[in-house]
Amino acid sequence: MLMEMNRYLSFTLFTGLSLLTTIPIEAYTLNPNKTATSILQTNVIEVRSITSVQPIVIYCPVGTVPQLPYQVWVTYSDGQGEYRQTKWSNSALSTEQSEADDKVYPIGSQYTINGFIIGDDTTENGYPITAKIEVVDTKNTISPKLIAHTIPLNNVKINGNNRLTSNRDLAIKEIISWDVSQQLYNYRDTYGLSTEGYTRSDGWDSPETKLKGHGSGHYMSALALAYAAATNPSHKEILRRNITRMVNELRECQERTFVWSEELGRYLEARDFAPEEELKKMKGTWEAFDEHKTKWATYGYGYLNAIPPHHPALIEMYRAYNNSDWVWAPYYSIHKQLAGLIDIATYMDDKSIADKALLIAKDMGLWVWNRMHYRTYVKKDGTQEEHRTHPGNRYEMWNMYIAGEVGGMGESLARLSEMVSAPEEKARLIEASNCFDSPAFYEPLSKNIDDIRNRHANQHIPMIIGALRSYLSNNDTFYYHVSHNFWNLIQGRYRYSTGGVGNGEMFRQPYTQIVSMAMNGVSEGESHSNPHINETCCAYNLLKLTKDLNCFNPDDARYMDYYERTLYNQIIGSLHPEHYQTTYQYAVGLNASKPWGNETPQSTCCGGTGSENHVKYQEATYFVSDNTLWVALYMPTTLHWEEKNITLQQECLWPAKSSTIKVTAGEARFAMK
């Protein structure tokens, strides 16, 4: 079934015009061929009902679950129409597994799936609908092409006096106030360098936690993004100074691992750390932690982390999430640090510092490749006990709760592979990226089987971002379809109306958002509001995934409609408007209120993503190809399009129902949508 949901209007633009056009955005879910009109006139509500629904016919590739629309076009008794959310009857896992079985539904099979338009009272469950399914001999062989890309953050500025600029300025002032020595403390402690004069870290980077480094990684990203977004020269100078200090001191730590082995005739590498017999006996206690802090010479060439490498090594022994006796999520922490260095390499205009940041990230990325390549493998067949017979089975490593949380390792390693020039390093980094695939999670999704249910939400969303990013280099459509299917399942089954997901950090069963809102606050027989819904990290990562998918589908308005929904309903409101505090979770439900906290990037995971969120609102406002500009968000901004050497200004009151686009400098010819 094809559904057009294009809210963009096309233009051919001749620069030099002072006023181009006004673009309406009202009711963007309405049919673009129809005009939105109010059904509330002179205080009399006109009762209307659904009279018809567009036909739903799905041609389903054999061996997969039909991709059912999460919204369908309905027509009302007054002649108006809009897209409405659906709920389908095939969401039980056993049903989906049957639908994906080519013996049950071979090529040529035809069947129907029933569902409802939710929020309608035609029946107890809603307005009934039916999808007709035909199984076809079509594999997922089409290779989607990258059509567009975003404009770099430093070439888009938010204008005006509004909540967007107020939040940005508040965030930048806070970022420049954070103590850079505190962010360096754990590294110096881990690499045997003096910590005199350095502030001990706190929060989830404190000496009592084994997630050290996650906050420092987010801090580096926040510095880089704030540097790109800042308009105040004195602020930029402080940011530049702190970026420079972070990069120089981290390289000093990393260079302590450059240890030559006469016996091996090469530098010690990641594969040399903790041979198998030693690994099997390795402990995760704080005593062991302190012991490994004294052995930086054994870490292996390029290792850079705020915790010693015995923690990522312990994952190869399938050690559990336990901050006292074993590990927290070591590769999650490594990812944040890689991402921070990559962001510095991307946005720092001091080439020597940008190059050094990239070098640090590359050397650490190659350490990861070395460890994964030589010390890990994938075995999928058999029981869990059989999977774990030998150390290093990635099928089990990345399927563990929390301990196996790797953040966006796949994404960062794929980005690194795009940034380095040596062919061998490119190949190794993309191989390392795919070493963070989770077969137990990916393979059902590749068939559109919903294996999202009951998983830790923010453990798995970044994995999908990594799958999509690696597709750019490995060209394996498996990864694109995993990402595409995941996104569609989120839209249809898991997101709240605000765009967020999760209940107590977990995906629950499909279509149970109302149950979560109603029951999550029940204790001792009494109902009360509970804020543990819509983790902010999840919204952060879903926006990242949506932005990347839109690069392949810039004419499909569903992606940026969702992006806009989540940015405006959760992300922007996750920063206190008067003083710097961000939300961990974003409460919804009767009498719910937002719990404020998270005053530093190391305070919690959402303190980390929160440190980045409010200096990059504009990062997905515009997408471009060679000769097309897509205006994807209606936001008061100034855009400099370097490739065309033109500057455009979008004027609107935020949030707006219309935008005016002006060309303020330069001359070029292109299409605008």
Spans of features found by a protein language model:
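Bacterial N-terminal signal peptides that target proteins for export
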Residues: 2-12
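Bacterial N-terminal signal peptides
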Residues: 12-22
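Boundary at the C-terminal end of the N-terminal hydrophobic targeting segment
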Residues: 25-29
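Solvent-exposed, low-complexity, repeat-rich "mucin-like" stalks and linkers
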Residues: 39, 43-81
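Extracellular interdomain linkers/hinges and stalk-like, low-complexity segments
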Residues: 41-58, 130-150
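Short beta-strand/loop motifs in extracellular/secreted proteins, especially
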Residues: 70, 84, 670-672
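Serine/threonine-rich, repeat-prone extracellular segments and beta-strand-based repeat modules
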Residues: 78-135
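Glycan-recognition and catalytic cores of secretory/periplasmic carbohydrate-active enzymes
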Residues: 140-673
